[in-house]
Amino acid sequence: NDNHVEGKILRLRQQYFLSAASIGDIVQNHLSSYATLENLPDKVAIQLNDTHPTLAIPEMMRILLDECGFDWDKAFSICQKVFSYTNHTVMAEALEKWNVDIFKMTLPRIYQIVVEMDRRAREELAKAFPGDQGKIDYMALIGDNQVRMANICAYTANSINGVSKLHSEIIKESVFHDYYLFKPNAFKNVTNGIAYRRWLLASNPGLCKLLDETIGDGYKHDASDLTKLNKYADDKTVLKKLNEIKLANKKDFASYLAKSTGQVIDPNSIFDCQVKRMHEYKRQH
């Protein structure tokens, strides 16, 4: 619960911990293979899914500046090429912001980097929108005693997308309209979906075998081929095989759960699952 100062500090520390751990791992793995970060943009792409991992940007800057000796321009150029941002919020008032005092106290070095990012951003924006101080203040990374996570992402990222065609148009016309004017080529649409090569090809070999037998293996390279399965919607033989695959997968999961946690569940029951953080606003209580 972050309705009080202690909760806000804890959440900010959690966000930094997860971001810093991820960036540290990426950098370490890259250096073990290439011994330099000069080519990081050629080998690594980091997608920021909403603003919660925004601290990955100043943390990457910290590593490049403090630990690797890059100058600011080179370090920021690497970040611009590496980071992309997916927006999930169309209301400006709902965008994530952090009180400057909390941010500065909790993450002093990261705050210093964000302050310098803000200073340079304001200089660049002043050249793009001369005399329009209102626009510059709205797009700034720090303002009204708040660190604006979405603006850090929008200013840095090489790609900014919504999660549906309509959503992507809305953010261009409203919440990020000024950034759209500033860097229009960065705005794209990526409709929400799953990485089916992971959640189907790698995770569900039984279903893949059935698909191979019914529609061929073209779907492995072109997901639109999956629509060919529609013609089997009333095929009792195919539906029977599908149910057998589902049951086998449920038995596998039940076995794994029993071995790893000691919990025993009936694979013939309905599995109603939620993978979400535990929080009162999720109505889990």
Question: What spans do the regions from the language model cover?
Answer:
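A conserved ligand/cofactor-binding region detector
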Residues: N1-H285
